[in-house]
């Protein structure tokens, strides 16, 4: 009589699967903590001349815009450029912070693709 081959999961594979689930759970818990941490952060971005400051959370949620009186004197078009510069700076810093925090979260877990 021929023996059935089953699903190909030996004890070693089950152990690997169990470890993968544990790692996934660690990442999920860490991601929740990271989300909370990023939400509490305030990341500033500045225009090239420093007259406009944008503050975002670590999750890239806009918090505030501060415009110095000198920026108002430059006219609408220049002011728009300064606000855009400050927003891009804050966004870039926020993205870098998120990336760094995610690398810290996943380092040492030996996750494929990360």
From Swiss-Prot:
<dbReference type="GO" id="GO:0005829">
    <property type="term" value="C:cytosol"/>
</dbReference>
<comment type="function">
    <text>Binds to DNA and alters its conformation. May be involved in regulation of gene expression, nucleoid organization and DNA protection.</text>
</comment>
<protein>
    <recommendedName>
        <fullName>Nucleoid-associated protein PCC7424_2224</fullName>
    </recommendedName>
</protein>
<comment type="subunit">
    <text>Homodimer.</text>
</comment>
<keyword id="KW-0963">Cytoplasm</keyword>
<dbReference type="GO" id="GO:0003677">
    <property type="term" value="F:DNA binding"/>
</dbReference>
<dbReference type="InterPro" id="IPR036894">
    <property type="entry name" value="YbaB-like_sf"/>
</dbReference>
<comment type="similarity">
    <text>Belongs to the YbaB/EbfC family.</text>
</comment>
<keyword id="KW-0238">DNA-binding</keyword>
<dbReference type="Pfam" id="PF02575">
    <property type="entry name" value="YbaB_DNA_bd"/>
</dbReference>
<dbReference type="GO" id="GO:0043590">
    <property type="term" value="C:bacterial nucleoid"/>
</dbReference>
<dbReference type="InterPro" id="IPR004401">
    <property type="entry name" value="YbaB/EbfC"/>
</dbReference>
């Amino acid at each position: 009589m021929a023996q059935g081959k089953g699903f190909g999961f030996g004890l070693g594979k089950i152990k690997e699967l169990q470890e993968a689930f544990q790692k996934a759970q660690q990442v999920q818990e860490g991601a929740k903590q990271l989300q909370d941490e990023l939400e509490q952060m305030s990341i500033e971005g500045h225009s090239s001349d420093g007259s406009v400051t944008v503050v975002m959370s670590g999750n890239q949620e806009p918090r505030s815009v501060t415009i110095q009186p000198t920026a108002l004197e430059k006219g609408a078009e220049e002011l728009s450029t300064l606000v855009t510069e400050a927003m891009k700076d804050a966004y870039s810093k926020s993205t870098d912070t998120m990336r760094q925090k995610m690398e810290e979260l996943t380092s040492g877990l030996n996750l494929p693709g990360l």
